Structure formats: C-alpha cells, structure tokens
Design a protein with these regions (language model features):
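Acidic, surface-exposed loops and disordered segments
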Residues: 46-257
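Macrodomain-like recognition of ADP-ribose-binding/processing modules
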Residues: 1-45
C-alpha cells in the first residue's frame, strides 16, 4: 500500500519559490496516482495579501500537532524576526496550560501552541512586537494555521520560556489548527481611519483597506493613516488614538506591516 502524506508548506522555504515548489508536488502526486485537494493548492499559493484577507482571530483549536516542516518554517522566521527586530520571541509547542486558566475561561480552548512575544524593555518595544508579531501571524496563515493575539487571556507557565533581566513579555499569540477559520468582525470605514480621497493614490486606499483587516486590541482600530505626499517618495503618517484599553502602540506596529 502506498501512503502519500501532504502537508501545506509556506512560501520561500529553503530558498524555493511557490512557482518552483508547486510543480514538484504536482508531479509527485501524479506518480502516486492521487489528487491533491484544492485546499492544498490554495494554501501553497497564498500571497501576503491573501493571508491578510483570510486571517481572522481564532480562539478554539483542534487537538492536532504541528507538522515538522511547519515548525521548521516558524522557527526559521522567528530567528529572522528576533535578529531584525531585536526581540526574544519564543515558540512553545504541545503546552496546554497557558490558555487554560481563569483568564482564558470561555475565550480560548484547545490552545497548545503559542508564541511568547518578548523583548528588551524600551519605548518602542510594543510597536516592534506588533510589527514583527503580525509578520509571524501572516506566515502562520500561509502555512495553513490560525492564530489569535492575546493581551491578558493567558498565564505564564514556568519553564516554557526564558527572559534576560532587562526583558519582558508583552503578549502571547495562540497558533494552531482552528476549529473554524474565524469570521470577519465589524470594522470602521476607510474615511474613519484615514484621509483617503479621490485625490490620494489608489495604493494608499488599498493600504488603508488592508490596515482595517489587521487585528487590534478588542477590534478598537484606534489609528489614523494620513497621506502627506512628497517627492521622490511619498510619505504616510500613522498616529494612534486614545484608548482606555491600551495596546495602541502594539496595534500601530501591527498596522504598519
């Protein structure tokens, strides 16, 4: 009996491009006389914009292990993120306690894999956590996973992470295979969060529309994008609003991606 195991893999793994990987899988499938599901090709060919559109916050997860190739892709990008962003992000797997406490009761279930978003204390740490954390979230989406940012709905489990004396944890990000792909929540309009108009470039409006799809704390969307123009490179300014909930600096970093 021939078993042909296929798991979705991300873009750019080991220097391969999607258009190079896809024919290899197609040829292997033909030799094995199997038909790859449409969902496989959808994940394999997912672009950054596809990931932005399909990403929704998911809080309930299946009891399903992350494949080795998915873990390797995540760990590789975490290493890049830590180096570029001067962070100390850590991946924790097969650990069910962090999201099982009273803070997560009724909100999360089945979470066994998550990112500990940490770094050296500084004025811009939250913003960097947001920017690079969302980069990991979109990679997870392209790998066929789901995710959810968590500001307080978790507990720190001793022995699952390490911190230097001058570092702190800003938040966690749950990742895994969701029970559902999630749903799009109510959003503000382009005019609510920007100065987009018929006079501003189309790329700016599209950028604002993408920003409105980004996760923010309790969907508060307390940011404003302003097209300033300028040559040779046009400038865009982002400002954060006032929030009793907080996390606006982290939200701003997420939106910047």
């Amino acid at each position: 009996a021939l078993t042909f195991l296929v798991t979705p893999i991300g873009c750019g793994i080991a220097g391969w491009r999607v258009e190079e990987i896809a024919p290899l899988f197609g040829a292997a499938a033909e030799l094995a006389n199997v038909t790859l599901p449409e969902s496989f090709w959808k994940v394999l060919k997912m672009s950054d914009m596809d990931a932005v559109i399909s990403r929704h916050s998911v809080r309930r997860y299946l009891d399903r292990k992350l494949p080795v190739n998915v873990l390797n892709s995540l760990r590789s990008e975490i290493a890049n993120v830590n180096a570029e962003g001067n962070l100390h992000v850590q991946l924790v797997t097969d650990e069910p306690l962090a999201f099982s406490g009273v803070m997560a009761y009724g909100k999360f279930s089945g979470v066994k894999n998550y990112l500990v978003m940490a770094g050296r204390k500084s004025a811009d740490l939250d913003e960097r956590i947001g920017y690079y954390g969302e980069r990991l979230v979109l990679l997870a989406q392209r790998l066929g996973l789901n995710s959810c940012w968590a500001g307080i709905s978790y507990r720190k489990v001793f022995g699952t992470y390490s911190l230097e004396p001058d570092e702190k944890i800003c938040c966690y990000i749950a990742i895994g295979y969701g029970e559902t792909p999630g749903v799009q929540h109510k959003s503000k309009s382009v005019n609510d969060v920007s100065n987009a108009s018929p006079q501003t470039p189309d790329w700016f409006r599209k950028g604002v529309e993408s920003a409105l799809l980004a996760p923010t704390a309790v969907n508060q969307q307390k940011f404003f994008l302003e097209f300033l123009g300028g040559e040779p490179l046009p400038q865009v300014r982002i400002t954060r609003g006032v929030s009793l909930i907080g996390y606006t600096r982290m939200d701003m970093g997420i939106v910047k991606l």
